[in-house]
Amino acid sequence: RDRMGGGVGSWPIAGTAVYMTAYPRLTEDDGTTPALRDWEDILPVRQWLYQTPEQILIKASNGASDFGNKFGQPLITGSLLTFEHQENSEKYAYDKVIMLAGGVGYGTKRDCLKGEPQAGNKVVVVGGDNYRIGLGGGSVSSVDTGRYSNGIELNAIQRANPEMQKRAYNLVRALVEEDNNPVVSIHDHGSAGHLNCLSELVEECGGKIDMTQLPIGDKTLSAKEIIANESQERMGLLIDEKHLDHVKKIAERERAPMYVVG
């Protein structure tokens, strides 16, 4: 989504991924643990709260490749680093795992800069509904695992929907391939969801957002959860009102849910 949000729209091409964990201490197919390699015996084996390093490396890699293939952005390269070290009484390790997801894309010179919001521009959200997903994801991912309760940490986990991202991308691509791109500005929904994305769209001038127009998948969400959840595969756009009907027609063609929210 970051690459879709370059300038006033751009094209993702390929994905990359870097995985960083503590030593995985791999198990055999029958579930037994083989003898530790010399470097794996530096620190004692820890009890892991959610997943072992081995499980993370397998599942994260499978997930990144699966999402990229379904979205149409193949994962073409990456890196893996496992690390544990003890220096005197200090212990260091990637117990707090890191996955760096990146990629390659391109955009045109015409569309490389965002436009300036004007009175009358419409704030548009494209993509999926709001759910109790990814609440505080940006904050929880920045502190030690286990600092918060299990409920808070598990609610902070983001879930992926590659089909919805493909629909949103098809709309964005169609707009940037036109002779006159109707997009004034575009941002992806990342950390803090609507609160972050829609604020960035109107940060230079301010704007009005009608929360009743935001799509709700879970009717039990509070107002805070609606504006701050990180349900994935959503883009925020500023569109000049005169182009709105045209953009709606393309969204309908691509089956990309589109909502005018401000």
Q: What residues fall within each predicted segment?
A:
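Glycine/proline-enriched, intrinsically flexible loops and inter-domain linkers
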Residues: 1-262
